[in-house]
Amino acid sequence: MATVLIVGKSNVGKSTLFNKLIGKKKSIVDNKEGVTRDAVSDRVSYFGKSFKLIDTCGIFERPEDIISERLKNLTLNMLSEGDIIIFVVDGKYGLTSEDYHLADLLRKSNSDVILVVNKSENEKKVFVNFDDFYSLGFGEPLFISAEQGKNIDRLIEEVIKRLEKKGLKLEEEEEKDSIIRVALIGRPNAGKSTLFNGILERERALVTPIPGTTRDAIDELVEINGKKYLFIDTAGLRRKSKVEYKSIDMYSNVRSIKSIELSDVVVFVIDSLEGITHQDQKIAGIAENRGKATVVVFNKIDLVKNFKYRKQEFIEHFMERLYFVSYSPVVFVSAQERYGIGKLIKAIKEAYNSLFYRVQTSAVNAVIQRMIMFSPPPRGLKIYYGAQVDVKPPTFLFFTNGKKVPEFYQNNIRKIIRENIYHFTGAPIFLKFKNRH
């Protein structure tokens, strides 16, 4: 698919432009400098033609810390991916040394660049600096206002014109049901971004030893063995007590939860060195409550001493701490060494298939009647018959005499379905009860 990158220094409005072009709020927008830490991507569709758009991190001329340095390198490495570069500068405050520095890098990369002057609400004021913008060497600039939507259509038309001139195919919208959407979730620094990069076989997400370096939910469409997967690397979910109201971390938490809601399968990444914490239990609960298939991944096994002899220990730890998602397949990986990636993909596909599996009504009732015979329901409760009524997640409806079905007996029903009808590996089973009368 044709790919377009948005680049520029921090705080020139790249994320606002990205959100305007894709037609929804996906990149985090804030007036603090350097808010975007990850390259966020989505599809832009315009009159039946579409291309991939990537919002890159702001580039600093002289990075002040390890994160800024890695951000700069990450963005520079991505320049070769872009068929077109949208170079955004600030029309309100004019050019700075950072703009000239980035322009020099873009010229050296031989990229096809569209110079966009954002924040051009006041045309007369912006036009005073026209010669400065033109001197960057990218031809006549396009003056826009991402905030107000000014000249956005002209920008898209220019992008499409250049892409078509290159002979690139502008794909139609993919059939959504043909793609398995996978969210990588877990606590900060559990290794989600390293795993994300390992699956893609290249660096796409920012990876540093500092917890919480992923702020946006970033995604990538890949094809593995003929099947398309959309992998989403979410920001690590933090405890509410550690997140300030209206802070960037709060927006990241909301975005991560939204990514879970939009996914089919949630890959729950656990740091093997730290084990499963109370916060991990809460994160897994979010996925289960939303009816998502789950795969549990113990990461960093290359750092665990004598792991070969301790695998059962980790499985028992999982069963004890995450008993409510015990139906999930467990995969041991080293994201750093790319060990276990193949097994993970296989587990994801199996969990996805479980979401859509349907069982015969006759099988459900035969098993339930046997259960009632050998393990009768609590006094006063009668269960007459049932059937599977939905998928994604698998949902069963049982007709009763109206008495409440205790949670322990609901768990027994789920267990008997998994053991005697179909395992539904990775998928939660939802139960509904209705008074027959």
From Swiss-Prot:
Q: Where does GTP 2 bind?
A: 186-193, 233-237, 299-302
Q: Which residues form the KH-like domain?
A: 357-437
The answer to whether UniProt assigns keyword Acetylation to this entry is: no
Question: What Pfam families has UniProt attached to this entry?
Answer: KH_dom-like, MMR_HSR1
GO molecular-function term, one example from the UniProt record = ribosome binding
* Annotated EngA-type G domain residues: 2-167, 180-356
Q: Which PROSITE patterns match?
A: G_ENGA (PS51712)
Q: Which Gene3D superfamilies match?
A: 3.30.300.20, P-loop containing nucleotide triphosphate hydrolases
Give the UniProt keywords, A-Z: GTP-binding, Nucleotide-binding, Repeat, Ribosome biogenesis
Q: Which residues bind GTP 1?
A: 8-15, 55-59, 118-121
Transmembrane stretches in the record are none
Q: Which PANTHER family match?
A: GTPASE DER
Assigned protein family: Belongs to the TRAFAC class TrmE-Era-EngA-EngB-Septin-like GTPase superfamily. EngA (Der) GTPase family.
* Task of the protein: GTPase that plays an essential role in the late steps of ribosome biogenesis.
Q: Which NCBIfam families match?
A: GTPase_EngA, small_GTP
Quaternary assembly: Associates with the 50S ribosomal subunit.
Protein name from the UniProt record? GTPase Der
- Please name the source species: Thermosipho melanesiensis (strain DSM 12029 / CIP 104789 / BI429)
- Lineage of the source organism? Bacteria, Thermotogati, Thermotogota, Thermotogae, Thermotogales
Q: Which gene encodes it?
A: der
